[in-house]
Amino acid sequence: MTSDRQDRPGPDLPRHERRPRRSPSPRRRSRHHSSRRADLRGRLGAWLAAGVVAVLVIGVTGLYLLHHDSPVRHLATGTSGAAAGPGGQPGSTPAPASDTGTVSITDVGDMNFGMNGHYPPGGVGSLFAGVAGDLHSSLTVGNLETALGSSGTTKCGAGSTECFAFQAPAASARAVRQAGFSAVNVANNHTDDAGAVGIQETDAALSAAHLRWTGRPGQTTYLVRHGIKIALLGFAPYSYDRNLLDIPAAAAAVRRAAARAQLVIVFIHAGAEGAAAQHVRPGMETYLGEKRGDPIAFSHAVVDAGADLVLGSGPHVLRAMQWYHGRLIAYSLGNFAGYDTLGLDGVTADSAILHIRLRANGTFAGGSVTPIRLVGAGSPEPDPARTGIALINSLSRSDLGASGVRIAASGKIELARR
């Protein structure tokens, strides 16, 4: 199996995912014998007919259950965000008996591991030591904001002091995998830091480490957890990523993914950067003359198209979280890890780890936030002051009002009030 599968135009499913046609039962031939044998054959025929009916009923049921990632199945279980229930309340529509399974998802913010030969002396894995117990779930993901490898051409000109090109050794991918990560988003403004060769080396390093990735143009990544098929799509406002600025195309890609998978998770690398970029507002955001997308409009559009969870990165600060049609949108989890590559003054050092459980039909089954703070050169550690919770609550309330997520002091994500 390849690490990633590209979207194909049109709604047709691959051959192995199509519902097989049921062959008609063969007709039984009979000959006229004695009346006694005819009577026995008549009774036998009745028994066989009853058996065939039972087999057909079981067979049809089996086909339905085995091919549960068909478009019809999604409409029935409400994977489309618009079917979440009155008021868009999470959990307002009880999960059907066949959708009682859940997937636990852990998400972190932006991570890179150094540049220009300056890397953690204890290895990349040492960056995660302080939060090692928080990175294990059915699916642990994050935003990989660096190229991996040793070749390629840097995007920065000679002697540049305002340009940052991140590239870490290919072995860094193995350290990320060993820390507990299953997949990473590569749709961001640093995936091209070593040019086209760097992109190829990054993909090769991730593949060798058995670490899945998403975010290249046209790329949708599929994986299975606990029998639940999950689609991952990443978007950013750059030509070498899946395009965040074309909302209709993004929505169409999500609809195709929702027709093939039970859960759809969308990563967005969107918005301005830095301490002044904590607030999320409607409209296009810009930074350094670049259009960085409209995070709210984009997130709402992909949920309307069938996304069950939207995970944001890019601003390098914590941002608000929102309930929209019963689906959770986290606009930014801030920084997660770096090595002398991230400005860590004030709010840029405050971060969080998001833990979510989703049912197979996409509805919210529970979640929590672990507040962390980056210390030293950029290592995450638990934050005793729990600043991240207070920040997310404040931003969610001020920026999003009633749809803003509320997090209890314990870190538990509360259901939206009806």
Task: Give, region by region, the residue ranges found by the protein language model.
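Acidic, metal/ion-coordinating pockets
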Residues: 2-21, 26-32, 36-37, 42-418
